From Swiss-Prot:
Cell compartment(s), UniProt: Cytoplasm
Binding residue positions for substrate: 29-33, 78, 154, 209, 322
This protein's name: Uroporphyrinogen decarboxylase
Native organism: Bacillus velezensis (strain DSM 23117 / BGSC 10A6 / LMG 26770 / FZB42)
UniProt GO cellular component terms: cytosol
Length: 353
């Protein structure tokens, strides 16, 4: 990507609720996944090897910008990246996901956890960001982190879970230890995100993949206070802050209360319905990624409906309701990106005339 190309700040403007010439679009898990170049790379390197080599990681991160024409890049990393450096023995296993050999079972386990020093512990993350921002991208780079609940659920369950029984039992039966764990993880997330911003990330998205397992009462009691602290500390960095979780539409109003800029929605809550619930901040979403496997006519119809709802305010970013599946045709994402740009640009021109 040539440095001489004009910087495309459409995503940043929309995140702040400002007027744009078209609706910005990017896709969760746009980096890697379905791209043939990425698959070829994965034949030789594993996830950890790619993420630890800045040149390779930068290549994977910028591929969708070059191929799809999206308005933002998101760093190619895993939410588990910082955990080993605070003392969590985690391994990413093919076909399973993150596996932790010694799950958290007590306050004593939490007390053993250390602190993250990003420049010392994850220099490869920061070098990747600097490489992208200084030399390769003409769009904003989104940094990210996992959220305390999701990270804690892996640490307590020992890996992926369908019901998070152990996590919820721990939360309710040992509330003081739970708060200690939330605070430890929040400290890590804050310094990790700030380091990404200092290296050049222009926005931060916090992924709470599994928080939809909680009801609103539990979220407000056990999670919301620590999320408020995280976003309050990060807001001083003056970059857009985004919140997203899967199956967590019932928590969208609580996210809106937090000191953040963008509320990410999955496909379960329509944008009009979110607005009726009082969400006035920028909304990001929310095409069901499953539809990317459907014929183009189906995708176009649904994308148009989402755009018509989202464009009722300036604060709208088009995205999926979750990540890109590996079997999605890259040409579909390229076509969808062009459609979002063209349809929204024409509609905005019409609205202003």
């Amino acid at each position: 990507m040539s440095k001489r190309e004009a910087f495309n700040d459409t995503f940043l403007k929309a995140a702040r609720g400002e007027k744009t010439n078209h609706v910005p679009v990017w896709y969760m898990r746009q980096a890697g996944r379905s791209q043939p170049e990425y698959r070829k790379l994965k034949e030789k390197y594993g996830l950890v090897e790619i993420t630890h080599q800045p040149e390779l990681c930068a290549y994977v991160t910028r591929l969708p910008v070059e191929q799809y024409g999206v308005d933002a890049a998101i760093l190619y990393k895993d939410i588990m990246t910082p955990l080993p450096y605070i003392g969590v023995d985690v391994e990413i296993k093919n076909g399973i996901g993150p596996v932790i050999d010694q799950p958290v079972r007590s306050a004593a386990d939490i007390e053993k956890l250390g602190e993250l020093n990003p420049e010392q512990d994850v220099p490869y993350v920061l070098e990747t960001i600097r490489l992208l921002v200084n030399e390769q991208l003409n769009v904003p780079l989104i940094g990210f982190s996992g959220a305390p609940f999701t990270l804690a659920s892996y640490m307590i369950e020992g890996g992926p879970s369908k019901n998070y029984n152990k996590t919820k039992a721990f939360m309710h039966s040992m509330p003081q230890a739970w708060k200690m764990l939330m605070d430890k993880l929040a400290d890590m997330i804050i310094v990790y995100a700030k380091a990404q911003i200092n290296a050049g990330a222009k926005a931060i998205q916090i992924f709470d993949s599994w928080v939809g397992a909680l009801n609103r009462e539990d979220y407000r009691q056990f999670i919301k206070p620590v999320m408020d602290r995280i976003f309050r500390e990060l807001s001083a960095e003056q970059v857009p802050l985004i919140m997203f979780g899967v199956g967590a539409s019932h928590l969208a109003g609580d996210w809106h209360d937090l000191p953040l800029d963008v509320v990410g929605l999955d496909w379960r809550l329509g944008i009009d319905d979110a607005r009726k619930q009082g969400i006035t901040k920028t909304v990001q979403g929310n095409l069901d990624p499953s539809l990317l496997l459907a014929p183009w006519e189906v995708i176009e119809k649904k994308a148009k409906a989402i755009l018509d709802q989202g464009m009722k305010t300036d604060g709208f970013i088009f995205n999926l309701g979750h990540g890109v599946f590996p079997d999605v045709n890259p040409e579909t994402l390229k076509k969808l990106t062009a459609f979002v740009h063209e349809y929204s640009a024409a509609k905005k021109t019409e609205q202003s005339s």
